[in-house]
């Protein structure tokens, strides 16, 4: 089987020749650049480290590393990593070197950390000394009281770190004809040059989109106490996504196998909102967005949603979601056996292969291998599983554990 065939078979709930593997095909299955530098030293690999996601400090895995670990999927944004003028040098928080996208401009904060400003000077992201991520520092619609204040989402999103510091191809609008043509050309080149499956990030966040714009607590208050205001913002988000979806798939739809949607619905112990509130406010809008995706795309719909979301999975299946990530198995109700038993016929699992909050960070290589074998035994039965760790590999994960994890994934149950 080719890598692409392996992924398609698994997501179609068929057992491939081995469980497919992902390292860095989207921004929650990757490795932090600090950890990646350590891994390269451990393996004797040379070359620059490219931190393509500046917010989360994620590295683009080199081809030699993808080959070494048997990776079967790549990120569409990889198509934008081949031109030297797309990159510039920048020191990581531990002082080790990296390259970052040329369109992102962190500046020293004068206290040993970094910040990023919008065009008008507003600080939209900060990374204090000793911290390994940029935090969102501005919720541009936090003080809005009327729906009319939601009209210009583009201006608001220019002050949201996640969109203002976006990864390719979202660093420029697809409404720009030159950028659209460039995205199309690069996507075709990437498709022709690999037999790996390709994932393209689209987003479509509803709950999270409201939280980015209004503030996490404020938007939850809106849903409970100001529902008309919350619905007005969510409807405006849906409108913007419906404008983007046809353009995105016209550019890359025939070059990708999986489209990555996103909406963090959970916490460590429960969903952020009750099932009743989800079904009233979020589900109808998710459904509209995912139906629009399906109208333009014949591949797999993948949803990244952190946390304890088991009670919402039946709704996600009903909406048309086919793949869930990161499968945060340490959260309440997210036990692998339960997830596979109750939802494995209709939902594929992309993640859950090794606990980043536990054994991957603090265990021994043999403990890592043991957990990987256990997870493949549960999630991999009958297909419906792409192996990757739970969310990103953190800066303090020992490189020997990373190697042990991917070697065990390649070996499977043998």
Where are the model-predicted features located?
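Residue-level detector of functionally special positions within alpha-helical transmembrane segments
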Residues: 2, 70, 92-95, 264
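Short, surface-exposed loop and linker segments with low hydrophobicity and enrichment for Pro/Ser/Thr
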Residues: 10-17, 66-67, 107-110
């Amino acid at each position: 089987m080719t890598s692409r065939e392996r992924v398609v078979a698994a997501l179609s709930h068929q057992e491939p020749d081995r469980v497919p593997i992902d390292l860095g095909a989207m921004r929650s299955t990757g490795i932090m650049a600090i950890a990646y530098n350590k891994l390269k030293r451990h393996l004797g690999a040379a070359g620059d480290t490219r931190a393509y996601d500046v917010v989360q400090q994620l590295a683009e895995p080199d081809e030699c590393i993808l080959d070494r670990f048997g990776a079967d999927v790549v990120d569409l944004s990889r198509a934008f990593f081949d031109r030297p003028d797309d990159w510039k040098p920048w020191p990581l928080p531990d002082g080790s070197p990296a390259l970052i996208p040329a369109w992102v401009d962190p500046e020293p904060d004068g206290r040993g950390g970094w910040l990023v400003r919008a065009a008008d000077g507003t600080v939209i992201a900060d990374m204090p000394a000793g911290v390994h991520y940029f935090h969102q520092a501005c919720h541009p619609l936090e003080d809005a009281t009327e729906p009319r204040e939601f009209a210009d989402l583009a201006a608001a999103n220019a002050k949201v770190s996640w969109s203002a510091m976006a990864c390719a191809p979202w660093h420029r609008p697809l409404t720009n004809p030159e950028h659209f043509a460039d995205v199309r050309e690069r996507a075709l080149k990437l498709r022709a040059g690999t037999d790996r499956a390709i994932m393209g990030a689209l987003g479509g966040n509803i709950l999270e989109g409201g939280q980015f714009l209004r503030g996490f607590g404020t938007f939850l208050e809106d849903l409970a106490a100001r529902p008309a205001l919350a619905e007005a913002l969510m409807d405006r988000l849906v409108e913007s996504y419906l404008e983007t979806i046809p353009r995105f798939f016209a550019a890359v739809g025939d070059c990708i196998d999986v489209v990555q949607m996103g909406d963090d619905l959970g916490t460590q112990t429960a969903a952020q909102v009750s099932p009743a509130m989800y079904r009233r406010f979020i589900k109808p809008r998710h459904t509209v967005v995912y139906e629009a995706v399906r109208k333009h795309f014949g591949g797999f719909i993948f949803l990244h949603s952190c946390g304890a979301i088991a009670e919402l999975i039946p709704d996600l299946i009903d909406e048309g979601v086919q793949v869930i990530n990161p499968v945060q198995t340490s959260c309440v109700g997210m036990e692998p056996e339960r997830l596979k038993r109750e939802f494995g016929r209709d939902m594929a699992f992309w993640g859950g292969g090794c606990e980043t909050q536990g054994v991957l960070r603090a265990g021994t290589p043999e403990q890592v291998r043991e957990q990987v074998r256990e997870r493949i035994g549960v999630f991999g039965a009958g297909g419906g599983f792409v192996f990757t760790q739970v969310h990103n590999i953190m800066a303090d994960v020992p490189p020997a554990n990373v190697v042990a994890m991917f070697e065990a994934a390649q070996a499977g149950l043998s």
